[in-house]
Amino acid sequence: SLRHLNAFSKEVEFLSPAQLTEKDLSNIDLRIQPWGWDRAIATYLLGINPQLEQFLPSNEALDTIRNISNRSFAACSLLPHLVSLSNDLIGDSIYFTDSHEKVMQFFNDNPALYVIKAPWSSSGRGVRYIDNRVDESNKGWMKNILEQQGGLIIEPYYNRVLDFGMEFYASEQGEIEYKGLSIFSTENRAYSGNLLANEAIKEGIVNQFVKQELLQLVQTNICSQLASAFKGKYVGNFGVDMMVVTTDDATTFKLHPCVELNLRTTMGHVALALSPTDFAPKRMMKIDYLDKYHLAINLVGDDLLDTNL
């Protein structure tokens, strides 16, 4: 049931685009925080009410946000630093800006399981999987991405045990605030839902595989590394997707500390906002699609299978 969401409705004033068009914004203290920033949303808001211009990021700022949103930023800057912190961390990523022919030569010389990512894509898209050989569909897709976006991110395929993430907020003062853990589920490699539980329960799930000290080490270093990278460039929510992986012999667990850097509000932030108090039961927030998307929040028992949420 979503009846418990009514507690938040008193804090929200809904405005239609027509109402926003007529609203006088000349003497108002306003901060706009969309799900994520890009030129499309800035142009859309400006078209609704020209007075919004003073509250919008400049074109230069939007370009900077786009550059940081490029998957190569996390792959080439954040991930290598985090992995160097401990032998219990794992993760490798290559950013190719070579010709399509050289990329194909790489796969011919190094047959294995790979994850291929476009530098920019909407959530859950722009990702392909290679199983030892590149089929014609993936060849064409990679050629198009190289031509349109100028690069490809190539990563090893890992044996995933648990998907989760850490959620943050970047302030105007250049400080990074840790908001909490996000333990989420996927279906057919796409997001499907989040566990709603207090931090102790979520930490307990992850700690079945990796120590809390390792999580704290990763969290602290994400805050310190991105504080300097984001200062004066980005203000708002962001999340870092992670995963617990196992070795080929399934005897050792390691933490991949940066599968994705999402420079926007995430469903993990939504889950944190809806998470219960310490004494409330666990819930599962699920997104289903029939004729349209549906959000459902249901109770889950203590026998929840933690690695298959």
Predicted regions and their residues:
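Glycine-rich phosphate-binding loop of ATP-grasp-fold ATP-dependent ligases
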Residues: D92-F96, L113-K139, G165, R189-V206
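Conserved N-proximal alpha/beta basic substrate-recognition cap immediately N-terminal to
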Residues: L2-Q105, S121-S122
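Flexible, glycine/charged-enriched surface loops at secondary-structure junctions
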Residues: A229-G239, I287-Y289
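A short acidic (Asp/Glu
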Residues: L2-L5, I41-N49, R125-R128, F164-G165, ...
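ATP-dependent carboxylate/phosphate-activation module, predominantly the ATP-grasp catalytic core
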Residues: F168-L226, N262-Y289
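A short catalytic or substrate-binding loop motif that flags glycine-/basic-rich loops and adjacent residues
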Residues: W120-S121, Y158-L162, K231-G236
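Phosphate-binding site of ATP-dependent enzymes
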Residues: P111, N138-S192, G239, M243-C258, ...
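Peripheral (often C-terminal) accessory segments that flank ATP-dependent C-N-forming ligase machineries
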Residues: A280-L309
